[in-house]
Each structure stands twice: as C-alpha cells, then as structure tokens.
Amino acid sequence: NIVLKANTDLGLSGGLNTGFATPSRFNTGTNLGYQSGPVTLFGTYGYNADDRAIVGINDRLRYDPAGSPLSYTNQDIDGRTINAGHNFTGNIDYKLTDKDVLSNSLSLNRRHSNDGALAGYTELDATQAFLDRYVIDRNDKARGLVFDNSLSIKHTIEPRKHELSAEVRFNRTRDEDNTLLWREPQNPDGTSSGPSTQGEIDGTSALTRQLTMQTDYTRPLTASTKLESGLKETGRWLDRDFLVFKDDLGNGNWVQSNLSNKFQFDEHVHAGYGVLSQSVGKFDLQAGLRAEWANRSFDLAGAQGIPYNYHSLFPSGVIMYKPSDQSQVKVSYSRRIRRPGTQELNPFPVFFDQQNVFIGNPRLNPEYTDAFELSMSKTGQFGSLQLSPFYRHTTDVIRVNINTADTVEGREVTSINFQNLDKSDSWGTDLNGSLRLGPKLNAFGGFNLFKMVTDGGSQSALSSNAVTWSYRLNATTQVTPTVTLQANYFYRAPVNIEKGRFSSIQMTNITLRKKLDGDNMSVAVRFADPFNTMYFKVKAGDDNLQQITARRFGVRATYVTFQWNYGQAPKIRLPQQDQPQPTSVFP
C-alpha cells in the first residue's frame, strides 16, 4: 500500500525501456502510473523477441555382456529457437477509508515459439566402421496465453502489527504445441539417399487453471507478543489432449498412433496456519504450525481414475539471539512440502529429438523436507560475514530417472522421467560475505558446500552419494559519479546424480551503465557470457549403454539497453506470492 504525506499526490509518472542484443534479440517496454487522492493506477506493457542457436551432441556407446564396445551412435545437433511474447499488467488500488484498501492486479501474457533442429546420426560398429547415416528434422511450434487476476482487500489497524487481509486469485494458462519429425536417409558423404520416412506429428493441447482463496490475520497479544494466522484454499486443474499421427513410409498416409491419449488432473489443498512470535530481552522466539488436507485424482483415457488423499502437519520454530546491533545468531527448524510441478506430472512423451524424450509421472507423490539451519552473522564498518550450516532430511524425494535403454513404440530412446525415492539426506554450509569501500568498490561473495546421499529404498535401485560445491562473486565500482561498472561470476562443480554425472557450469556477466539527466535516464551495455563458458554436459547410463549429452544454448550476447523515467512511480499492493518450491531434481 502507498504511504504518503497528508494531502500529497504523486500525480502522473511514466517510463520507457528498450534494448537489443546481438544476435537477433530485442525487448521494449513502457509503464504508466497515476496517484491522486484514494486512487492509485499503474500499468506496464512489454514485448520481447529472442532468436538463438543451439548446438550439441548426443553420443551413445553400447556394450556387450563382457564390457566391450558393441556399437556407437554419434549425433550432432544444429538447431535454432525463436521465442517472442507480449506482457501486460494493470494494477488498481482504491482507499475505501484510511484503514481499508481494495486492490486488483491483472496480468496477461501472449507468447509463441518456434524450435527447429537438424540432428545428424552416424551409426558405427564395434570397430567404429561406418554402418549408416541419416538426419532427423524436428520442428516445433508452440503458442500460449496466460491470464492471471488477483482481487484483495486489506484492513489495517496498526501497520505490520494488527492487520486483516483477504485475497482471491485465478490463473488460466492455455498452451498449444505441435511437433513434426522426419527421417531422411543419407550417403556417407552427407548427400540425400532417398525420400524422407518415419514422419510423426505430436500435438498437445493443454489447459491449466488454478484458484486460490486466502485470508490472513495479524494482531498483537501483548507489547512483545504477536499472533499470525490464516486459511488458504487452493484448487488446481490440468487438462491435456495428446494426439499423435505417423507416416512410416513417407507416402502421405497418416495414421493415428496408440500414443494418443487424454489426461485430467485435479488437486485441492485446504490449509490453515498459526505463528506465535515473542521477544524476550535479546531473544526473538517464533513457533508455528501449518496443517494441510489435500486430495487429488488423475484420469487417463481408457483407464480407471486414481484418487490420492493425504494430510500433513508442518511445524516450524526460530530462536534468534542478538548480542549486539552488529551480530546475530539464529537457529531454525521447518518442515516443508514440494508438490510435483505441471511438467513433472504430464505423462505424454515430449521428444527433444527421435532419440531423447521427456515423460512425466502423474503418480508422483509430494516430497517432504525437515530442514535444520544455523545462521551466524557479523556486520562491521566495511562489510558483513554470514555462516549458515544446514541439514535436510527429505522423504519421498522427487528425483530424475535417466533411462538410456528405454523404448517408445518399439523405438530405442533415452527417456527422462521422475519417480519418488525413499529418502535423501543433505548437509553442508553457506558462507557469504560483503565488502563495502564506498563508491569505489562494493563486492559480494558466496560459497556453498554440501553432500547429498539419496536412497531409493527397497523398491528402487536408484541411489546417489555426491559432494559438490559452488561459488559466486559480484563486484561494483563507480568509475565516475555517473558511470558504474558491475561484474558477476558463478561456478558450480561437477556433481553425481542417480545413473549419471553433471559436468561443471560457469557463467560471467559484465555491465557498464551510464546515467543521463540525473536519475531519469540511463544507457547500459551488458556482456552475457563473454568468454563463452556456459555449457551443459551430462553423462548417464549403466553397464549396457552410456550416453553423453552436451549443449550450448546461445547464451553469449552483447545487450544495449536504454531506460527513461518520468515522475515518481506509485507503490502498489502486489498479489501474495507462494513460497518458491525447492528444485531438487536437477542441480
């Protein structure tokens, strides 16, 4: 909510930003705001377009029972992806009284993408002598429309101490995706040796809806005690139609495949929570409990629906001690839940190419994590230092399963899907520090080290035992009063996963910004991945087959942006955001 001096209006404000990058990337946006009396209006519009090359390999090596090479499949990928979209947001705040504010937030997104790739295959025998050569042509076109609206009201008796709020939010997402695949035989020299065959059209029509209703109440019980409580209802509905046609001979005779199917998924979560906070001298204490009752069901065409009901309790607690204004020690415990995402539940195959396919699992259960954390921080004249060791125990952990010997309709593929494993334990520490030397240098550094042990349980052979680490650096210097130089770097060491190993990842960004007309205008140049180090590589398989997959996603680019602002943009009440879900599937 906007906080203004009495009888002060911000009036009209606006802004414009635009930018482009090499190669073939462009974005532009504008915003307009108005505040007068009880009314606050703010709207934005943006358009972005991105065209980049994607190159990589998928090389497969098969072994005989004795462990000797049996055959090779080498795949080189040359692709290009084009993404573009329009974004619009509109926000209205209306002060009904000095203590009551009615707010509405609307967001619209229209997007489309075209993803094309040529994958060249070379088949070799055990001695790497030539056997066959062919090309798979893949073309994917996708369209999407997102509607999101939130209506809320807030009654404030004492800011941040005694408040009552309620919100209703609805999200609707429609996606249409069509993929065309062809196989073209080639001679050893790469020339065509015949007409294209094995044509395939995969069409997916998806509708996702989510309705959220919640109310939150905060009030002081005493001068040092505060109670927070609330209720939340969430409904999620997924509907997907998957239609597959095949032309095996390339003669125009398209036949519907048995892969065609329909999928419906419904989920409802009823939740309530209470948090009690108490201050005692230099200690701040907090204890909370959230209860959830959930039910869900999914249906596939021709199969009986499978319902699933569960209830959960999520206790939490925090003890914080401040021996001085410059130091703090905090101990915390919380129980968390991660529900499977939309793509993780989608059971229809999504082909990256003829050899690699992603398949979701609608039978996934949510995973639960008990997190214990200790945080110690110290702030001084020239910066701060924070050490945060942690331990996390997760049950029904959702992990990726890479199967290099899978088949889809008789075709040998490498499939990527998900399944629940029995448990996972991880422990490690985060070390973060900042250095402040005035305008000439402000720096930040972070280091993370952790070990994760995953046990698939008696029903699964999947397991992992890995140690990895990462660090990030950020430095900013004011070259002149109007020129700022900023650089950041990230590195993550290699890490083992179930049935595979991810190689290291590193990335650099450098930005030079120049202010014009005070703070009203600026121009910037950003170099993304200037050293071309952003590279993805994973090795996966078993004793019978090993696959190496590597990609460069065209991250490297030079961006030039211009920004202009007029007036003072009003502050608006944004919709409440859910806690971000942990992403434990891929490192």
Q: Predicted segments — roles?
A:
Residues 12-15, 69-76, 129-137, 148, ...:
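Extracytoplasmic loops and strand-loop junctions of Gram-negative outer membrane beta-barrel proteins
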Residues 54-70, 115-125, 130-132, 176-185, ...:
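Outer-membrane beta-barrel translocator domains and adjoining extracellular loop/strand segments
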Residues 76, 201, 210-214, 254-261, ...:
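Outer membrane beta-barrel strand-and-loop segments of large Gram-negative receptors
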Residues 87-111, 136-300, 386-387, 425-448:
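Face-selective signature of the C-terminal outer-membrane beta-barrel domain
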Residues 454, 466-516, 539-540, 544:
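C-terminal beta-barrel architecture of Gram-negative outer-membrane proteins
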